[in-house]
Structures are given as structure tokens and as C-alpha cells.
Amino acid sequence: SWNKNQYKEGTNEYVAVRPELKKQIEELYRKHPEEARDSFGEDPFEVKNILKYWVFSEKPEFHVIPTDTINIHIDKDALLRSGIMLPKTIRHLKGEDLKDAIPDKLYIPLTDIRMLTKVDLLMLEMLANCNWERPLYLAISVGSVSKLKFDNYFVQEGLAFRFTPFDYKKWGDVGENRLYAVDVERLYDNVMNRYKYGGLDTPGLYLDETTLRTCWYHR
């Protein structure tokens, strides 16, 4: 949803994190709730509102992140329809009990982070707008591109990590000696039934470092 002037080179390359503004905003919501909501939205620390009212504000002095913790709303119905792997401790629940066990928001701490890059902001916007209906993936061959600590929220489904709103490590789904949660059933189906292999036995075929790395991942 960014226009060209918002993502062109030299614009929004870095946006400062200003946690000291959080108390001022909270005070405004306590004393003047209607004025505050008109100015910064229903939840001032939700990613969509931070982008709309701060990062993309026409006022240059507002081009900051005014908190040390941002959040993304979780549409629980959409999440359950998506087929995402639920933490094992709530997998047995049904109906309203299951929905009640799912957090209302994904909270992302910015502690000790002084600024967010354009890449960070783009990732946050994609997560905020996917509504948890359309899966977002990161290839396992790609190194870390963001200082935001998302590793615990990844679930491996094959050669890709899927973004989720669950901190699987806290929920107890990351096994010993593992870095990420694994959706075993979906991974098995992808590797055994959906992936297509072949051609590596072609005489004289040259495998560059990128292709060879992918072969190692398959293995």
C-alpha cells in the first residue's frame, strides 16, 4: 500500500524508535480519548496506525515509532480457517474454548532497538495486512533480513518458514536442539507428495553454490 514517494530510495530508510513518547500518548488517551482516537486511531500502538499516523504523516516530526512495543491484531476466525499449525497445548480445544486460548494480538517488542529499517517496516505492514488468511513465507535459504526477533514465530513447512502469531518456544513446541517449530504433517506432505525432483543426474550438469545449497536443504 506504499506509494512511490514512501518507498523510493532515500525515503524511510530508517525510522527512529522513540519509546519515551509512549507515556505521553497514553496520557492523551486517558484525558482526551475522543481527540486521541481521532488523531491516532483506536489503538495507537497497532502497526497499521503507527504507519498511517506516524511514519507516513505529513508532519516530518511524526516520522518515528512512538513506543517500545507494537502490536498486530489477530483475526481468530481467519487464523483458524488458514490451517496454520496451532501450539500443541491448545490443539485439543474446540469452538469458543479454542478461540479464547488464541491471543488477541501479536506483540512485538522493540526493546534495545533504536531504529527500524525500510525492510522492517515493509515486513510489519505485510503481517498487519495479511489478516492471517493468506500465508506469508520466508525461504529457509534466506538469511536474517530484519532485526525484529521473529524466529520463535516461524513454523517450518518444508523449504520455507511460515509466519505465525504464536511464539512456539514459549508454547513448548520447539524441540530440544531445534531452532524452530516444525509442522511435521505438512512438511511430510510437501516433501513426499508435492515436491518434484529430478535432473541432478544429467551428465555434465554444473551446480552453482546456490543450487547446491538447495540440494543440501532437500537432503
Task: Describe the predicted segments one by one.
Residues W2-R219:
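ER/secretory pathway lumenal C-terminal domains and tails of membrane proteins involved
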